[in-house]
A protein has these predicted regions:
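A short hydrophobic beta-strand element
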Residues: 70-72, 109, 143-149
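Short, solvent-exposed loop/turn segments at conserved positions within beta-propeller repeat blades
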Residues: 28-33, 72-73, 109, 154-159
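Acidic, small-residue rich beta-repeat scaffolds with periodic aromatic anchors
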Residues: 141-189
Length: 189
């Protein structure tokens, strides 16, 4: 049995043939070249999408494990869509820079301050904020994401370790919650 091709990432928008379809969050007509992709429908026809890009260089497509839907990442902006449909199911993010695979089929998207988890069925959720400004050395082992969170606070300027459990959705460490709002000793109210 041969697997049917669902998409083809294009070098540029086609210069001939049917007009491409702009895919944006607000349905605006987007004429500049973004991330061009040809999709192959189940009926044998095809269409070309021009995805509005986000803020990074990450351009990739993932076939989701438990659905016919695809995850398209256009320069950091995510689009979940079915190749047979022109309108995306979901659009989110603008600054994703890295994708990691969890052992159970989940995808972990790294942003500057938090993570977004894509479940095998295409649903997604965000972690709480982990860092003030920057995540580094992210890795996944046994559904536990670990790495470093940047702390740019005055006289600190350091990277702090964190761990995030994908199953219990709990964060340990990180830089964002490392400062408590303590009352000065002289205030009694």
């Amino acid at each position: 049995m041969t697997e049917t091709k669902k998409y083809e990432i294009l070098e540029a928008l086609p210069t001939y043939g049917p007009m491409y379809i702009s895919v944006t969050e607000s349905d605006e007509t987007f004429y500049s070249e973004g991330f061009p992709v040809r999709f192959y429908k189940s009926d044998g026809t095809d269409w070309v999408a021009n995805f509005k890009p986000g803020w990074t260089d990450l351009k990739i497509i993932y076939e989701l494990k438990d659905t016919a839907n695809l995850l398209v990442i256009a320069c950091g902006t995510c689009y979940i869509l079915n190749p047979d449909e022109i309108k995306p199911i979901s659009i989110f993010g603008v600054g994703y820079s890295t994708v990691l695979n969890a052992p159970d089929g989940r995808l972990i998207l790294q942003d500057q301050t938090d993570l977004t988890i894509i479940e095998p069925d295409g649903t997604h959720w965000d972690t709480e904020r982990i860092s003030w400004d920057g995540l580094a050395e992210i890795k996944v082992e046994n559904n536990l994401v670990s790495g470093l969170a940047y702390n740019p606070m005055h006289e600190v300027d350091e990277w702090i370790e964190f761990k995030y459990d994908l199953d219990t959705k709990t964060l340990t460490g990180g830089s964002y919650y490392s400062f408590e709002n303590k009352k000065p000793w002289w205030k009694i109210w």
